[in-house]
Amino acid sequence: MKALNKETAAKTQRPERIIQFGEGNFLRAFVDWIIYNMNEKTDFNSSVVVVQPIEKGMVDMLNAQDCLYHVNLQGLDKGQVVNSLTKIDVISRALNPYSQNDEFMKLAEQPEMRFVISNTTEAGIAFDPACKLDDAPASSYPGKLTQLLYHRYKTFNGDKSKGLIIFPCELIFLNGHKLKETIYQYIDLWNLGEDFKQWFEEACGVYATLVDRIVPGFPRKDIAAIKEKLQYDDNLVVQAEIFHLWVIEAPQEVAKEFPADKAGLNVLFVPSEAPYHERKVTLLNGPHTVLSPVAYLSGINIVREACEHEVVGKYIHKVMFDELMETLNLPKEELKKFAEDVLERFNNPFVDHQVTSIMLNSFPKYETRDLPGLKVYLERKGELPKGLVLGLAAIITYYKGGVRADGAEIVPNDAPEIMNLLKELWATGCTQKVAEGVLAAESIWGENLNNIPGLTAAVKADLDSIQEKGMLETVKGIL
């Protein structure tokens, strides 16, 4: 079996135009895969220099393979099973600024550099007042980026055509706003001056983005078979699902410079990220939260099997298409396409997603993901959404414990205050008290949900039905 490097595998040389902070699985299977497709299908013609954002990382492994690796996409695409391997050749080199700080800073001197992309985890975009301008390098990611920008500003004497377009991918709502704010803090801390601040404001753009792709990472279970198939000893294979979405809150001039649409990619440049964030929370996370207890109490353990089930599958379809979708303010066709993609993701034959892994903290999840939809639906339709109400009753029933219809013991696990509350309420033996007590828990909901017209009676009725008929018969009753 051959080693994987530029001697054994073709690697196209392209101009270095992108600095990427982060070398982990997500960026390599998402951003670098997107750039690979843009290079293949458009005239983008760019390569990436990877910068390791912390002292210990993977740049040595990357450089050992001349930054070549494969992405293994697995899942359903329009109902067809896909299991593909693609060699990604877009990373030209990988730097560790803790041992190669001069080379890192020289990136700012390359006139053709245009983009900065990052994923330094949710904790990465943070201000550390201990960072100094002459640190080699600053410990925080925004500190390193400010050092780089300031060096570029000085190198090109404030030339506004040498600004950079910055796309953070960290999982923080409005991540671009947070990063920009943190850079301003460093400009002030280090007294870099009003002229530099103005150059940063006018020549550079920091744009909020929303990323979405499940990336399980290195395929330990399948790696021997993958290497055999490739005939390369690739130790950086990264597995990912087919679905990908990158929403970038930026004007069309930026989209023209980053022509992902011409490569047929699901990259959207939009005036506001907020509705897409809401869409993801409502149509991806929201269904997960109610599907899991309904499936579990029906004797189903895996998300895919729940979606395939003749009764529970119809339930989740109803919740998504008839209830939650009705509460969002985006074009209907766009929402329908997104919901269909979500169902394909839930049905991924390569992922056994245990419903119990989703059920931890179910009440707070319901409060952020499903309760807003329940309220909007009631306001717009004048009635409660039966699927979302049943999902809430299923969560409450799960916390009762006991035994499932198939004989499996139900062992709920959550924060002690939730467990204690539900234990006390179920000990009364009265579903009216259980419904009222849960809905009245302002520590969970931030309000008394008994004030929502009809909700207490609807939850009680579902609790009674689940106790008397079982979960599946109760689900059938609302379809």
Swiss-Prot record:
Q: Which residues are NAD(+)-binding?
A: I18, I19, Q20, F21, G22, E23, G24, N25, F26, L27, R28, A29
Q: Which GO terms describe its cellular component?
A: cytosol
Q: In which pathway does it act?
A: Carbohydrate metabolism; pentose and glucuronate interconversion
Q: Name one GO molecular function term.
A: tagaturonate reductase activity
User: What's the domain of life for this entry?
Assistant: Bacteria
Record bears the keyword Lipid biosynthesis = no
Q: What is its EC number?
A: 1.1.1.58
Keyword terms of this UniProt record: NAD, Oxidoreductase
Q: Which reaction does it catalyse?
A: D-altronate + NAD(+) = keto-D-tagaturonate + NADH + H(+)
Q: Biological process GO terms, please? A: mannitol catabolic process
Matching entries from Gene3D superfamilies are given as: N-(1-d-carboxylethyl)-l-norvaline Dehydrogenase, domain 2, NAD(P)-binding Rossmann-like Domain
The reply on keyword Oxidoreductase is yes
Output the PANTHER family linked to this UniProt entry: ALTRONATE OXIDOREDUCTASE-RELATED, MANNITOL-1-PHOSPHATE 5-DEHYDROGENASE
Q: Which HAMAP family match?
A: Altron_oxidoreduct
What's this protein's family per the entry? Answer: Belongs to the mannitol dehydrogenase family. UxaB subfamily.
- Provide the protein name: Altronate oxidoreductase
Q: Supply the source organism for this entry.
A: Phocaeicola vulgatus (strain ATCC 8482 / DSM 1447 / JCM 5826 / CCUG 4940 / NBRC 14291 / NCTC 11154)
